[in-house]
């Protein structure tokens, strides 16, 4: 906590919300770990009130779960969670690629292609996983941005944190970065050709592969 400094103009609970989310995503807190509100308040040197408000927001995002002792623990994804998240995500991102084909201009397509090239370069250079994950996340964000549909973007933002949770787990295993990049390229090639049905099928195949891999990772976690 030593590197965390309060920014007075921003409400404290929002600062703690962002900091705690970062700590969940970087593995400081592990899935299933119980969060001690009093201990966090002491560590940050504040009252419990802004910590409690931050934790309520994280519960709303699906990153924390209330327990039967009036506390919270870090969400542990289940196979059912993965199914439910991707049942939302697949049709929305299929719609996104359709809209990109209709709405995106040449400059935006070039940005998408450069994003894939940057990811490939990072993988080749042995860049750490957190950066590869960020670059691949950016590809999906650009697809949604270039759909030019703010309501679609808002819908995806409601489940964005849980999607990111899945994305971190999805990079467990050998050659996952290369596999995911290859699937992203297939989607982009069909977008460039303006082939809506093929682009949607590649989105479906990509996410089906993700689901299968995530369930395998979760099953292995149970066994270990």
Swiss-Prot record:
Entry-linked Gene3D superfamilies: GntR ligand-binding domain-like, Winged helix-like DNA-binding domain superfamily/Winged helix DNA-binding domain
SMART domains hit by this protein: FCD, HTH_GNTR
GO molecular function, one term: sequence-specific DNA binding
Record bears the keyword Transcription: yes
DNA-binding region per Swiss-Prot/TrEMBL record: 37-56
UniProt xrefs under PROSITE patterns: HTH_GNTR (PS50949)
Residue intervals of the HTH gntR-type domain: 10-77
Keyword Transcription regulation: yes
Keywords (A to Z) from UniProt: DNA-binding, Transcription, Transcription regulation
Annotated PANTHER family: REGULATORY PROTEIN GNTR HTH, TRANSCRIPTIONAL REGULATOR, GNTR FAMILY
The protein's name: Uncharacterized HTH-type transcriptional regulator YdhC
